[in-house]
Amino acid sequence: MKKGFMLFTLLAAFSGFAQADDAAIQQTLAKMGIKSSDIQPAPVAGMKTVLTNSGVLYITDDGKHIIQGPMYDVSGTAPVNVTNKMLLKQLNALEKEMIVYKAPQEKHVITVFTDITCGYCHKLHEQMADYNALGITVRYLAFPRQGLDSDAEKEMKAIWCAKDKNKAFDDVMAGKSVAPASCDVDIADHYALGVQLGVSGTPAVVLSNGTLVPGYQPPKEMKEFLDEHQKMTSGK
C-alpha cells in the first residue's frame, strides 16, 4: 500500500514537472492563437513537437523559436521524414475507417488521401485492379480539397457511412450518386491528419513508413518506386 502511494506521488510530481516545462510553449501557442494542440517530445534535444489542426510545429523548450514543416533524419542512405513517421500512430488509429482495396498477393500497402472531385483520383481508382494485381493494397482516407463544409465533404461522409463503403465509393467514382447517411466517422479527422502529414492536394500517397508521395503515379511506375524505396529504407 505504501509503495503504491509512493508511486502515485512520483507520477503526480512528474506530471506537474512536465506541465511546468511546457508552460512557456503553451504561452507562445496561446499568443499565436493556437488553441487545440498536442505537445510531445521531439527527436531533437531542447525542442518539443506540437501537433495542431493546421500542421506540425517544432518549438524550443523556452517557447522562443518555432519551425514549421517536416523534420528529416539524414543519417542513413535515404532521408527519412521523422515527422510523418511519428504520425503513423494517428494514421493507424484510423485504420478501421479506411476504405481498403486489398491485393491478393500483398507486397506493399499505401494510404491514399482522396477527393471525389479530383480527376487524377478518378484515374487512380479506375486502375485499382492493376495496382492490386501488382501486389499494391490501397487504403483510402478522405481529403475534401474544398474544405470540411463543402458538398464533396458531405458526399464523402455519405460514402464512409454507407453499409458497403467500397461499393458506395465505386459508384460515386463511376458517376453515380450515393444516398445521404450519417455515422460516427468524422471526415475532419481524416482531413486534419492529412494536413499534419503535409497533404496539400490529391491524390496524396502515404507509404508504410510515413513518407508522403504527392500526386498520381501509374500502377507500374508506383510498383517500381515502392520496390526501390523499400530497398533504400530497409533497416531504417
Curated annotation (Swiss-Prot):
Keywords tagged on the record: Disulfide bond, Periplasm, Redox-active center, Signal
In which family does this protein belong, per the annotation? Belongs to the thioredoxin family. DsbC subfamily.
GO BP annotations, alphabetical order: chaperone-mediated protein folding; response to copper ion
Query: Pfam families per the record?
Result: DsbC_N (PF10411), Thioredoxin_2 (PF13098)
InterPro entries per UniProt: DiS-bond_Isoase_DsbC/G, DiS-bond_isomerase_DsbC/G_N, DiS-bond_isomerase_DsbC/G_N_sf, Thiol:disulfide_interchange, Thioredoxin-like_fold, Thioredoxin-like_sf, Thioredoxin_CS, Thioredoxin_domain
What cellular component terms from Gene Ontology apply here?
A: outer membrane-bounded periplasmic space; periplasmic space
Does the keyword Signal feature in the UniProt annotation? Answer: yes
User: In Gene Ontology terms, what is one molecular function of this protein?
Assistant: protein disulfide isomerase activity
Q: Which organism is it from?
A: Escherichia coli (strain K12)
Q: Which residues form the signal peptide?
A: 1-20
Q: What is the lineage of its organism?
A: Bacteria, Pseudomonadati, Pseudomonadota, Gammaproteobacteria, Enterobacterales
Which function does this protein serve? Answer: Acts as a disulfide isomerase, interacting with incorrectly folded proteins to correct non-native disulfide bonds. DsbG and DsbC are part of a periplasmic reducing system that controls the level of cysteine sulfenylation, and provides reducing equivalents to rescue oxidatively damaged secreted proteins. Acts by transferring its disulfide bond to other proteins and is reduced in the process. DsbC is reoxidized by DsbD.
Q: What is the effect of changing C121V?
A: Loss of activity
Please list the disulfide bridges: C118-C121, C161-C183
Keyword Ligase present in the record's keywords: the answer is no
Which PANTHER family does this chain map to?
THIOL:DISULFIDE INTERCHANGE PROTEIN DSBC (PTHR35272:SF3), THIOL:DISULFIDE INTERCHANGE PROTEIN DSBC-RELATED (PTHR35272)
Describe the location of the Thioredoxin domain by residue ranges: 36-231
Report the locations given in the UniProt record: Periplasm
Result for mutant: C121A: Partial loss of activity
Top-level taxon of the source organism: Bacteria
State what protein this is by name.
Thiol:disulfide interchange protein DsbC
* Subunit structure comment from the entry: Homodimer.
